[in-house]
Amino acid sequence: MSVYTERVAELVQREVARILQREYADRLQPMVTITRARVTGDLSIAYLYASVMGDTAEEREATFRQLESLADEIRNQLASRIRHKVREIPELKFFHDESLEEAKRMENLFDRIREERERRLEDGEDSADARE
């Protein structure tokens, strides 16, 4: 990616995040965070990675589908904010960023491993005490 496309990607990410926070916070529940953005070399498409916070997978999926349905509306608002900074307003394509969910799964896995080790250590100590 060229320096210009990187700057445009950063600008799009920042402005879309602001738009979501200020204009759509009440409509997009639970909270949506734009974690990353990439822009094609010709600046025609912006790929936005969104993390959706929610208690259930169904809730997160419904919010993400709603976000996708708002893409054109968000693009229009983006255009009014950045049209003087870029030659073309890119089409917005949203992707579900599961990195936070994956991190949570990994943390839970490590917790289970830690608990299993502690249990084995306790069992080992109990066995050693019984032999004495």
UniProtKB/Swiss-Prot annotation:
GO cellular component term, pick one: cytosol
Q: Does the keyword Cytoplasm apply?
A: yes
Keywords assigned by UniProt, alphabetized: Cytoplasm, Ribosome biogenesis
Task: Give the GO molecular function terms.
Answer: ribosomal small subunit binding
GO terms for biological process, alphabetical: maturation of SSU-rRNA
**Compartments in which it is found:** Cytoplasm
Record has Phosphoprotein as a keyword: no
What's one Pfam family here?
RBFA
Chief subcellular location: cytoplasm
Family membership, please give it: Belongs to the RbfA family.
Subunit architecture? Monomer. Binds 30S ribosomal subunits, but not 50S ribosomal subunits or 70S ribosomes.
Q: Which PANTHER family match?
A: RIBOSOME-BINDING FACTOR A, CHLOROPLASTIC-RELATED
NCBIfam families per the UniProt record, alphabetical? rbfA
Job of this protein: One of several proteins that assist in the late maturation steps of the functional core of the 30S ribosomal subunit. Associates with free 30S ribosomal subunits (but not with 30S subunits that are part of 70S ribosomes or polysomes). Required for efficient processing of 16S rRNA. May interact with the 5'-terminal helix region of 16S rRNA.
Recorded protein name is Ribosome-binding factor A
Q: Which gene codes for it?
A: rbfA
